[in-house]
């Protein structure tokens, strides 16, 4: 691996996810990849977001998804990226305690609208990298 790339632990990935609120969900629709910006909540190891019926909800709940957040500083050439891979699951009507807690959270969608469906990423796998600029 490049000496400027440092792998993040799962705990570091979760810390970064917990400190931010906007990311991108990647889904497949009509055999084409699509990426949507969403604001999200993190509950333990569960990433969840709100959406309306349509392409995003359908794509996110038909199988495997990827979710990504990042940050970079163009002046220092440093930054990081976290990727969450898992199975998109509609938890809107779920009865388990975590789903109920997520659905009752106060997440207000930036894009507005009712966004009455909640999607969580089940069986998540967390990976991340930090880019560290080393002079010379």
Walk through the language-model features, giving the residues of each.
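Short hydrophobic/aromatic-rich beta-strand segments that constitute the beta-sheet cores
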Residues: 49-51, 67, 128
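Short, active-site-adjacent segments that bind or coordinate small-molecule cofactors and metal centers
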Residues: 104-136
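Short beta-strand segments
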Residues: 20-52
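Extreme N-terminal tail/first-helix region
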Residues: 1-18
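Beta-strand-connecting loop/turn residues
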Residues: 45-46, 63, 124
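A structural signal for short, well-ordered beta-strand segments
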Residues: 40, 86-88, 123-125
